[in-house]
């Protein structure tokens, strides 16, 4: 059975009715068929697929935000399946639990803002320690709005950033915040800096396994740099 109670209505996921192993088998078959029909190649050997957790794995996503006048309520989430309507959801099983449990409190918070009908989206990015939410705003926040956002982020240990136009307008709500996020792989002593809107692998658990697999296949010598 699906791990999310909104599966079937929400368009964010499409394969939760399959077991994890069945999803992998389906995707592998589709990949092999693409290689044969489009690439005109057939691999001699196919490694076993890399597996990761089935829930709370998506450390980067973009939520739509919409104030619905008829409900007098701000909705935050993904579109309904094959629809422009926004799913009325209070949790999401594929994002980190920290983000999932904040969906409903965020809706209540945004409903109090003076520009609640001028916020089209939130883009979030998480690493091992920080949870950043980039709030797209079409009008300036009032002083009261800023105070409310600061109180919320301090209490819930997240960081609000704002975006007024393009990506070059993104900035932390509090100027003292570090504007770069660190992704670390302790096993291989790797540390990368990135921005909340940078393109990254949304599943950090898969990253770890991918690097282990690549290193095992390459078998680099001590004097070789990868």
What residue ranges belong to the model's regions?
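Accessory RNA-recognition modules of RNA-modification enzymes
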Residues: 1-226
């Amino acid at each position: 059975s699906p791990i999310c109670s909104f599966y079937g209505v929400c368009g964010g996921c499409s394969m939760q009715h399959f077991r994890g192993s069945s999803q992998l088998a389906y995707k592998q078959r589709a990949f092999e068929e693409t290689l044969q029909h489009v690439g005109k190649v057939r691999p001699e050997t196919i490694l076993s697929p890399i597996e990761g957790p089935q829930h709370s794995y998506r450390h980067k996503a973009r939520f739509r935000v919409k104030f619905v006048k008829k409900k007098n309520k701000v909705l935050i989430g993904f579109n309904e399946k094959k629809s422009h309507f926004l799913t009325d959801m209070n949790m999401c099983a594929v994002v980190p639990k920290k983000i999932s449990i904040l969906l409903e409190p965020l809706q209540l918070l945004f409903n109090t803002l003076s520009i609640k009908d001028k916020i089209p989206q939130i883009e979030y990015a998480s690493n091992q320690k920080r949870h950043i939410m980039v709030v797209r705003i079409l009008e300036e926040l009032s002083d009261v709005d800023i105070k409310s956002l600061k109180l919320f982020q301090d209490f819930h240990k997240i960081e609000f950033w704002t975006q007024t136009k393009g990506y070059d307008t993104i900035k932390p709500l509090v100027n003292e915040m570090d504007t770069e996020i660190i992704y670390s792989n302790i096993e291989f002593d790797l540390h990368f800096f990135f921005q909340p809107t940078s393109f990254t692998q949304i599943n950090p658990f898969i990253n770890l396994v991918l690097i282990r697999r690549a290193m095992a296949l390459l078998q680099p010598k001590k004097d070789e740099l990868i």
